[in-house]
Each structure stands twice: as structure tokens, then as C-alpha cells.
Amino acid sequence: MLKPIKGVRCYRCSRPLLEERQEFCYDCSRKKHVYQQGIAVFGYQSPVAQSLYQLKYHARKEYGIFYGHYAAVYAKKQIQAWKIEVLIPVPLHPSRLAKRGYNQAEVIARAMGEKLNLPVVTDAVKRVEKTKPLKELNPQERRKSLQRAFMPAKNQAHWKNVLILSLIHISE
């Protein structure tokens, strides 16, 4: 059975906290992130981990649609409070996209956009460097690997509030 994360969460990364008066988790209290705020719907354990693996590597897009619809309902109030204008799925490197045939983050983003009546923009950011799978890297290697992996596309609109969608938040 799927159980969404509930209770007190870190203001920055959405990780569950032990004490109500805490605002930030240990990691977020000592490290600066490149994003202002995040929200996680589920913890990364079975059956979530298994279904995301199936979505990513076995074209089980129905899982992405389910997670997108669920996330839209679960996070609707927060997304409205943030005044999100567009959803931007984290892009894959062109070679990975060609191999997989689709971007799993885009599947989730499109399902969310459908429920929230928000546009999904897939050409705002480009993946310019192919990186190793992040799960194989330590925190310092992840940060270094991603520093030059993305570039904003030219001539893009200037939105104030965007929601960048990724399947997994890898904590440091």
C-alpha cells in the first residue's frame, strides 16, 4: 500500500522531521541548495521504488500517470500557494532520451499539468552533459556532475515561479 509522507517536514526539501518545532532537516540546516523549496509525495521505498524503476526502465508509463495525478491532488494547495506558472520536467540527455524513448519526469509532469491546468514546458532547460546515474555517486560527486549538466534554452519566457519535476530527490 502506498503511504504518502505525512506530518512535520523540512521547509526546504520536504523530508520528514522528528520534532514539530524544527524547520529544517540536518542537511538543509547546514547546506545551501540550488532550489528554494521542494515537496515530496512518497518516500523512496517499496512499492514506490519498484514502480518508479518500472516506469524508468520498462516503459510502464501508467505508473507515471498515476504518480502525476496523485501528486497534483496531494500538492495542489502548496503548488497554488507557490503561484506556479509552469511545470518543467528535468530533461534527459539526448542519448538517454533516444535510448528510452521518453522522459519519465515528463510523463509525471504532463499528468500533473492536466489535473492542475498548468502548462508543461520541455524546452526551457537542456541537458548538455551526460552524467553517470546519480545513485552511483556520493554527494560531492553528484554536485560536481550536475554543475554543468544543464543549460537554460535561449529566448525563454521569464517566469517567476516554476516547478521543476524530478522522479527522485537524492538527499545529501
Language-model features, listed with the residues they occupy:
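Glycine-rich phosphate/pyrophosphate-handling loop used in enzymes and phosphotransfer proteins
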Residues: 1-171
